[in-house]
Amino acid sequence: MSEYTVTGTFQARDGWQSFETEIEAPNENVAEEHTLAEFGSQHGLKRTQIEIEGVDA
C-alpha cells in the first residue's frame, strides 16, 4: 500500500477551511474515500461539505 497526501477544503462554522492529510491506501480512489469517511466521522460533515482538490502519491 502507498501513502497518499490528500488536500482540499471543508465547510467549517466560520467558512471553508483547508486541510492536508496523509492516508495509506492501495490507490487514489480509496484514499479519497477514506478521507471523506474520516472527516465525516470526526467533524460530523456530509460528503457535500468536503471538497477534495488533489491526491498526490
Curated annotation (Swiss-Prot):
Gene3D superfamilies: 3.10.20.10. The keyword Ribosomal protein applies. It holds the Pfam family Ribosomal_L18A. Keywords: Ribonucleoprotein, Ribosomal protein, RNA-binding, rRNA-binding. Transmembrane segments: none annotated. One of its GO terms (cellular component) is ribosome. GO terms for molecular function: large ribosomal subunit rRNA binding; structural constituent of ribosome. Belongs to the eukaryotic ribosomal protein eL20 family. This is Large ribosomal subunit protein eL20. It comes from Halorhabdus utahensis (strain DSM 12940 / JCM 11049 / AX-2). The lineage of its organism: Archaea, Methanobacteriati, Methanobacteriota, Stenosarchaea group, Halobacteria. The gene is rpl18a.
